[in-house]
């Protein structure tokens, strides 16, 4: 009924180019690499789900929008009290940091959002079982987001 073809546990370097029914993206769009991954996922999937507050709203990484990318990177990699000889990463593999962190839907069309940090298992289960039943929920019911 369900076949997982690509995940961080298997291999993200060579996902299928087509035939993917549901794609699941987590994490905010923080750099140029994230943009490319989101675009590839959108091209290859019939349905794209943004999972977690970071993918849905930008989450904690979007807090850097308040101070700017340069200030945030300098604080994180150079000025922290535990850092000795810090260097801000500069790698093509990591991608160039964006000036503004956003949720996935600011880059590509997202069909379903499952917010939460982390998302509740009930919410994720509801979304996946609805999709397996051939329904794409527009809004997840409030009871799957109730926190005690």
PLM feature segments, named:
Residues 1-148:
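Iron-sulfur-associated redox domains of electron-transfer enzymes in respiratory
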């Amino acid at each position: 009924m369900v076949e997982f073809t690509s995940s961080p546990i298997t291999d993200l370097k060579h996902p299928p180019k087509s035939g993917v029914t549901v794609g699941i993206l987590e994490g905010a769009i923080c750099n140029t690499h994230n943009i490319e991954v989101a675009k590839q996922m959108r091209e290859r999937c019939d349905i794209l789900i943004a999972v977690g507050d970071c993918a849905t709203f930008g989450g904690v990484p979007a807090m850097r929008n308040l101070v700017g990318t340069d200030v945030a990177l300098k604080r994180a990699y150079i000025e922290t009290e535990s850092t000795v000889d810090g260097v801000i990463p500069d790698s093509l593999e990591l991608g160039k940091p964006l000036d503004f962190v956003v949720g996935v839907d600011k880059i590509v069309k997202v069909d379903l959002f499952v917010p939460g940090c982390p998302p509740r298992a009930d919410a994720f289960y509801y979304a996946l079982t609805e999709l397996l039943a051939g329904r794409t929920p527009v809004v997840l019911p409030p009871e799957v987001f109730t926190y005690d």
